[in-house]
């Protein structure tokens, strides 16, 4: 656990995040950047493109996110609530 906490302050690699954390990161990044290309560009600093795409597909499939237009993603907040952003992920989203 100590190593995981240290790694958040010293830079992240994709394997350090749980599946749930990856999903939360992607969902909050969508709120910040609705343009899919920009979103992927920003998130590749902390997640692999494969993880980003997989989480976008899962969020769309579970109707937590919807695609509006060819390159725009939007959280479907009328369908589901946004997950709370854990403390350890706030700085990551803030710095995207």
Question: What is each model feature region?
Answer:
Residues 1-15, 92-95:
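Long, low-complexity, charged/polar intrinsically disordered regions in eukaryotic proteins
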Residues 2, 10, 20-22, 26, ...:
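Generic short amphipathic/hydrophobic targeting helices enriched at N-termini
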Residues 15-44:
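Short amphipathic alpha-helical interface segments
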Residues 46-61:
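Short amphipathic alpha-helical interaction segments
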Residues 60-71:
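A short, conserved structural fragment
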Residues 71-77:
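Minor-groove-contacting beta-hairpin "wing" of winged helix-turn-helix DNA-binding domains
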Residues 79-96:
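Short, amphipathic alpha-helical interaction segments positioned at domain boundaries
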């Amino acid at each position: 656990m100590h190593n995981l906490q240290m790694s958040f302050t010293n830079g992240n690699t994709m394997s350090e995040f749980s599946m749930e954390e990856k999903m939360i990161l992607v969902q909050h990044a969508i709120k910040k950047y609705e343009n899919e290309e920009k979103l992927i560009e920003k998130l590749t600093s902390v997640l692999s493109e494969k993880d980003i795409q997989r989480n976008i597909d899962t969020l769309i499939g579970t109707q937590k996110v919807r695609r509006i237009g060819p390159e725009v993603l939007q959280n479907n907040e009328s369908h589901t609530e946004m997950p709370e952003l854990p403390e350890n992920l706030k700085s990551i989203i803030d710095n995207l």
